[in-house]
A protein has these predicted regions:
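Catalytic machinery of carbohydrate-active enzymes
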Residues: 1-335
Length: 335
């Protein structure tokens, strides 16, 4: 059976769809293609369970110099290509389907459409949400495989394969010593409630370096905080480095998602706020200390790895001290 999975959300949601992709492909009865957006596509790039990966550019994800018309023409070509594929089934991989996904269904016109949410004439298999509440997003998305009677009854590990050439280049550029553990501090977060301040990251780095022979890799979203399209944390990274002049910290300015994935693949543990980077670490099998502000750990905790969630009662990560996070690090990552 030819199956198209449409997952057009962010990095974390896309990675949390990979157990469903794996279960369908590894059943031996289905060819699985995936449609996503250019922003999330790199996390699926080398996935062996995907026959064909299609992606389009959202208008607000256009690169500098990429015109709106060119973007729309590219999307039209993709629509025509998908229509020719003659899929048997389309799965809308979202906890509740939306109109954006349905637009692609109208183009593809499969025999069956599987989705979660409210009824629609185009949706042939409308599934109820999993009965367990609260439910992890990976379990919610995996429930979309119920009509296929898969042998797996629960989602397995996430799948993410780094680009080996990029990883090798970063290993050389950053002078990574393979005999010494590398721990990643990922300092960026989209939500203000999940943005742990620079001084606390510096304090954490001091504590880790004082107690463990290690290399510390500092990772962040590139760009200035004032960039209106893609705000980054260049200033925060510089502040942390200035506070830790004598520590074994390697500031790795990853300018693309494949670079971030490759950099994390060189590490043996991760401290990060909830978000796409946290799920990348989990998908690579790293033990994770996850800082949660105003989001629900029951739905979004790192999947199928050793992890510890820290969420203060205020739901503001800056209520956490560097000592609290270090204790979680020592318990979760170095033991």
């Amino acid at each position: 059976m030819r199956v198209l999975i449409i997952c057009r959300d962010n990095i974390g949601d896309t990675l949390l769809t990979t157990p469903l992709i794996s279960a369908l492909a590894q059943s031996g009865q289905h060819q699985v293609d995936v449609l996503t957006n250019n922003y999330a596509a790199p996390v699926l790039q080398h996935n062996p369970d995907i026959r064909q990966l299609f992606y389009y550019t959202k208008l607000h994800h256009r690169e500098a110099g990429q015109g709106r018309l060119a973007c729309l023409l590219q999307r039209l070509k993709l629509m025509l290509m998908l229509k020719k594929q003659r899929y048997d089934v389309v799965i809308l991989a979202k906890s509740r389907w939306d109109q954006h996904g349905l637009k692609w269904v109208k183009t593809v016109r499969p025999a069956r459409v599987i989705a979660l949410g409210h009824p629609h004439p185009l949706i042939t298999d409308l599934l109820p949400p999993p009965s367990q509440s609260p439910c992890h997003i990976s379990e919610t998305l995996f429930s979309l495989g119920r009509p296929f009677n898969l042998s797996a009854t629960a989602p397995g590990k996430l799948t993410l394969l780094p680009d080996a050439a990029i990883a090798a280049s970063l290993r050389d550029t950053c002078a990574i010593d393979p005999a010494v553990p590398v721990y990643a501090l990922q300092i960026s977060a989209r939500k203000p409630s999940q943005q742990w301040e620079a001084a606390r990251f510096a304090g954490l780095a001091e504590k880790i370096a004082a107690r463990h022979p290690c290399q510390i890799m500092l990772l962040w979203s590139p760009g200035s905080r004032d960039n209106p399209r893609h705000p980054g944390d260049d200033e925060k990274a510089r502040e942390i480095m200035a506070l830790c002049p004598h520590l074994p910290i390697k500031a790795v300015a990853t300018t693309s998602l494949p670079q971030l994935i490759a950099a994390m693949s060189l590490c043996q543990g991760l401290v990060s706020s909830d978000g796409g980077a946290m799920h990348i670490g989990a998908a690579l099998g790293l033990p994770v200390v996850a800082l949660f502000g105003d989001s629900d750990p029951a739905c979004w905790h790192p999947w199928q790895v050793n992890y510890q969630v820290l969420q203060p009662a205020s739901r503001e990560v800056n209520a956490l001290s560097s000592s609290e996070v270090y204790d979680a690090f020592a318990h979760t990552i170095t033991q």
